[in-house]
């Protein structure tokens, strides 16, 4: 799928159908996160794949069903206190979510409500912190990104218009 189409049509998904994500597809999603750049190329992040423990993790986010009802959730663990850690985690999460959508896999980033508990659950070590949880699964209903052009997706998005968002100086 064309890059602009993937970006324009990607929406956070909170309803998933049952079923696993094929291993080869999931590996490509993880590779998209791995290949993401990082501040000063420090690469101070790791990914913890939650399959069995995702039910426990679901109680530690703002919307439990986002994690509970998916086959897999990825915790992005970063170096605590690094000035780049949140930035790097966001970049990796977005790459994984876009790669997933390109494969027909939906995703949703999840805000953490109990940081200490999630750190313990995923085995974050001293000096590490879970920055974000991203859930992945097949969307409840089939969504064909190509049913609209990128221009149509952009025009129909419930987002602030570009002319109000951007200023030139």
Q: What do these predicted ranges mean?
A:
Residues 1-169:
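Acidic, surface-exposed loops and disordered segments
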